[in-house]
């Protein structure tokens, strides 16, 4: 158990630092590409390029980790991310920005499937939700604190935060190489179901009708809603309250603290007490209500409270869904978790685009649609999560039911 904690601590550090670079880009990207004479539509294409590459390559990396092990894929993902940050900061032409973002989408998508599969290899089913929560906390720390760091260091130069992110990512490789053992023994590699062909035509559609289909749909819905929220949050608060980058950055940092605390400390105990299915249902309801409350906020502190309420639900929802997906298979966990990341990437493609279109029509529409999406997931969970492929299922009343894998 002590070894597992040490290994997961290394993964926490690695994922947090790797995702920090992604977060750093959020507040800087619009200003950075503007210096190249690019328009808002170019910004949208640039963001979509990153998300599309993640969507396509996440299952490929998950499958490769089933074939060759978790450690080499982790190293490749983190080092590749460092290189992409450096290239982005050194870019002098618009095409170089697109190349750097495309490469970042490809290589950064290797980190999370391999890290989550590592946790799945190293933990029991009872401990897995807690382990996934710790990884999600690392994800939250990196992505949420990144915008604050990016905004603060952008005063030096718009390219400086990218150099900083590259240096930190390169540093994160050291503990992986020096202290993280491989979690997947050679005899378990390349088992049936671990082909490395990645996304075949219709594979994602077929997965929706498989044993984890509804869980993959939930992964898409929560990613769609959250990235829609994030995509227009700065625009929404600027238009409604006149908030500038510093105040928005402060809100995002507070969101990160809440998210990391919830995922790192409460996910495991709550899942053991009530089970993932109950956590998912409660979290979907909290997120739906949070979207609506956001529309009612009038003061800065009310904005903080309503955003915090929404983030609590989201922080519990992500690891619960991921944990159920990892429990759906005892062999091809990397592939299943790669599909999970692919559906989340698909949500990241459409979420900001739809939110931006809705925002142009009415600034309240993105949050109303976000609430509706969460309610659709909630109602669906009452019908389809009963068939989740678990050894033991726990409902919200605390009683347990036997299931199958």
Regions found by a protein language model. Give the residues of each.
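Helix-loop-helix hairpin linking two adjacent transmembrane segments in secondary transporters
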Residues: 135-178
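C-terminal transmembrane helical hairpin of 12-TM major facilitator-type secondary transporters
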Residues: 277-321
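Helix-to-loop junctions at the C-terminal end of transmembrane segments
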Residues: 58-68, 262-276, 359
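Juxtamembrane intracellular "pre-TM" segments in multi-pass secondary transporters
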Residues: 2-3, 181-217, 399-405
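Conserved MFS/SLC helix-loop-helix module at the cytosolic interface between two early adjacent transmembrane helices
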Residues: 55-92
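Helix-breaking motifs and short loop linkers at transmembrane-helix boundaries and internal kinks
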Residues: 37, 69, 90-96, 107, ...
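Cytoplasmic helix-loop-helix junction between adjacent transmembrane helices
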Residues: 100-141
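Short amphipathic helix-loop junctions that connect adjacent transmembrane helices
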Residues: 27-40, 232-247
